[in-house]
Amino acid sequence: MKKTIVALAVAAVAATSANAATVYNQDGTKVDVNGSVRLLLKKEKDKRGDLMDNGSRVSFKASHDLGEGLSALAYAELRFSKDVKNKDGEVIKQPIGNNVHAKRLYAGFAYEGVGTLTFGNQLTIGDDVGVSDYTYFLGGINNLLSSGEKAINFKSAEFNGLTFGGAYVFSDDFDKNGLRDGRGFVVAGLYNRKIGDVGFAFEAGYSQKYVKQEVASVLPPPPGSVTVYKDEKEKAFMVGAELSYAGLALGVDYAQSKVTNVDGKKRALEVGLNYDINDKAKVYTDFIWAKEGPKGATTRDRSIILGAGYKLHKQVETFVEGGWGREKDANGVTTKDNVVGVGLRVHF
């Protein structure tokens, strides 16, 4: 589950970990390094069991105090593995440590009591929306513009539990006459309050982006013809609310999206329940209902996820998680799927 954490200049370097090691702190300049190795042993229906990298990373965070509450910041995050895909875009291999690459790379400014403004390859505020996903790797229905390789992102400081912001993402194609695939914006608001042992959260976001759509042809295309694409807008919104008491939390999210000139919408509802048994152990469950397509030709999905997590140490986390899904297409044909995984995360 993603929590809204906003705290002056330090929070501006997103994903700050309490376990970060400060390697330099002098004359207003601070540099932190942290990371984690995340491994997952997974078995999916009709596939072989496999051991894979589940997002291992190393991050570097730097901030420079400019005075008067203003600071400059920079963030770089390295990942170590990339899926191998075939020509149709299907994943055929998931190696471990086959590709060291920069997953995030951005810089910007933070102003105390106002917020942060960053530029580069980063998550947007849209990624913060969602309260019902308590899982480690199977849950989540976020449909917003949540990241961009060329993004400008603003996130406010917290004002009595309220945080808000927006982001603009540039298209990868700088050709003026080219497709604008990926270009768009997102705005979001996050509200979190806690009174005693009772907590409440409400989050909402809206985004628009251009997506590439194939131009339909009345006649079958001749052999050797080139597929033609055009830009269409995808409009999406997501809302969620969470109620918590002591170690028990219940979250509900709803997401919907629609592409211009494409029949039908995508809708999804996720309900999550999490119970922290103590500081080390938790159990959780998630239910997801989704449907896609025009009336009379709708595909429906149902999923249930169960899991438990246990911390062997404040920096060593283990978990087991299983999911069972059922999809029913427009013709009434039902397909079932299941997956189970055991994971280990060692933070440093």
From Swiss-Prot:
GO molecular-function term, one example from the UniProt record: porin activity
Mode of membrane association: Multi-pass membrane protein
Ordered alphabetically, the record's keywords are:
Cell outer membrane, Disulfide bond, Ion transport, Membrane, Porin, Signal, Transmembrane, Transmembrane beta strand, Transport
- Which SUPFAM superfamilies did the record assign? Porins (SSF56935)
- Report if keyword Protein biosynthesis is assigned: no
Q: Which residues form the signal peptide?
A: 1-20
GO process terms (BP): monoatomic ion transport
**Localization:** Cell outer membrane
Instruction: Give any Gene Ontology cellular component.
Output: cell outer membrane
Q: What InterPro entries does the record tag this protein with?
A: Gram-neg_bact_OMP (IPR050298), Gram_neg_porin_domain (IPR033900), Porin_dom_sf (IPR023614), Porin_Neis (IPR002299)
Please tell me whether the keyword Transport is annotated for this protein.
yes
- Assembly with partners or alone: Disulfide bond interactions within and between MOMP molecules and other components form high molecular-weight oligomers.
Which protein is depicted? Major outer membrane protein
Source organism of the structure:
Pasteurella multocida (strain Pm70)
